UniProtKB/Swiss-Prot annotation:
This is NADH-quinone oxidoreductase subunit I. [4Fe-4S] cluster 2 binds at residues 70, 99, 102, 105. NCBIfam families: NuoI, PRK05888.1-1. It catalyses: a quinone + NADH + 5 H(+)(in) = a quinol + NAD(+) + 4 H(+)(out). It is a peripheral membrane protein. InterPro entries: 4Fe4S_Fe-S-bd, 4Fe4S_Fe_S_CS, NADH_quinone_OxRdtase_chainI. Belongs to the complex I 23 kDa subunit family.
Length: 180
């Protein structure tokens, strides 16, 4: 070992100790998660829930838009119909082991039945436990939109006006006129 190698090795050791000394009293980056709550941004997308309307009925009308827009295909449902003609999902299933929490299902839902919550603690030991059924997804309240009721807003006639005559409403399209 030459004198030059000895000096370089010693300088390297001194520099390492100096760097440790500089960083020893800085604020730690590690979060003590279970003891301290984690800061989540206001628009954080976490666990998906199904909500109810203000009347207590489930909002989902089984339109299948959420399953169609899901890029990984983790949502599956089957439509059924009540005696009064209202649609509802006979089963609604989300496989959270495949879900990427993109939020497209929430945007596609016309009834605001699907909502993403800031809940992120979904760790399980078995993958089968990450498949949530309708009973596990449905919450008792309306979620982010407490006053919205799909069946009170859609399909309600406006007194004195026929279809296409209301403000900000387009004229109905005659689909048969578009055919070749």
């Amino acid at each position: 070992m030459t004198l030059k190698e000895l000096v370089v090795g010693f300088a390297t050791q001194v520099r390492s100790i100096w760097m440790i000394g500089l960083h020893a009293f800085h604020k730690r980056e590690t979060q003590m998660y279970p003891e301290e709550p984690v800061y989540l941004p206001p628009r954080y997308r976490g666990r998906i829930v199904l909500t109810r309307d203000p009347d207590g009925e489930e909002r989902c009308v089984a339109c299948n838009l959420c399953a169609a827009v899901c890029p990984v295909g983790c949502i599956s449902l089957q439509k059924a119909e009540h005696e009064d003609g209202r649609w509802y999902p006979e089963f609604f299933r989300i496989n959270f082991s495949r879900c990427i929490f993109c939020g497209l299902c929430e945007e596609a839902c016309p009834t605001t039945a699907i909502q993403l919550t800031p809940d992120f603690e979904m760790g399980e030991f078995k993958r089968q436990d990450l498949v949530y059924e309708k009973e596990e997804l449905t919450i008792s309240g309306p979620g982010k939109y407490p006053d919205y009721n799909f069946y009170r807003k859609t399909g309600v006639a406006i007194d004195g006006k026929s279809k296409g005559e209301a403000d900000n409403e387009a004229k109905p399209i005659d689909v048969k006129s578009l055919l070749p």
